[in-house]
Structure formats: C-alpha cells, structure tokens
C-alpha cells in the first residue's frame, strides 16, 4: 500500500482551509484517510500551520511520500531538515 501525506480541503466556498492527512495514494482527495497530522490555513496572513511533528517524522520514516505542496510546507516548518538529519546520521 503506497501511503501519501497530502492536503484534504475543508471549509466553505471561497474560504478553504486544509487538513494534512496521511492516506492511501489510491483514495480520493477528500476521501478515506489513515490519520490527520496537521492543518494549514492559507487565508491567514502568515499561512498558519499546525503539525504533529513526531507523527509526521514517524510516517516519513515508514516511507510515506509527501505531495509537492506538503513537502514545501514541511520544509518551511523545518520538518524535512530534521528528517534528513535523522536519516543520514545513522
């Protein structure tokens, strides 16, 4: 089963916010997911992001692939750097 970390759209028309979910890659965008690991609100001035950092790192270490947008969000939050440091320090 290929697992992805990706965004699920929530909110109302013209006012979206997103949940960062871990889901099977074959599931629909807003369909079944395994776990919610954070949220992202692009409408706030500073693009508010909340993450369960330990869970994200655990899923990445298990082989979950982040989508391009989620990869950018994780990079800005410093999670990808921590993941690469832990991966190559072994």
Curated annotation (Swiss-Prot):
GO terms for biological process: translation. Signal peptide: none annotated. Keywords: Ribonucleoprotein, Ribosomal protein. Pfam families: Ribosomal_S16. Coiled coil: none annotated. Belongs to the bacterial ribosomal protein bS16 family. This is Small ribosomal subunit protein bS16. The gene is rpsP.
């Amino acid at each position: 089963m290929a697992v992805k970390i990706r965004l699920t759209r929530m909110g109302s028309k013209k006012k979206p916010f997103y949940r960062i979910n871990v889901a099977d890659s074959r599931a629909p965008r807003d369909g079944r997911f395994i776990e919610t690991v954070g949220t992202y609100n692009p409408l706030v001035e500073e693009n508010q992001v909340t993450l369960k950092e330990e869970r994200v790192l655990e899923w990445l270490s298990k082989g979950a692939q982040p989508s391009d947008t989620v990869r950018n969000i994780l990079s800005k939050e410093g999670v990808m750097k921590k993941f690469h440091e832990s991966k190559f320090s072994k």
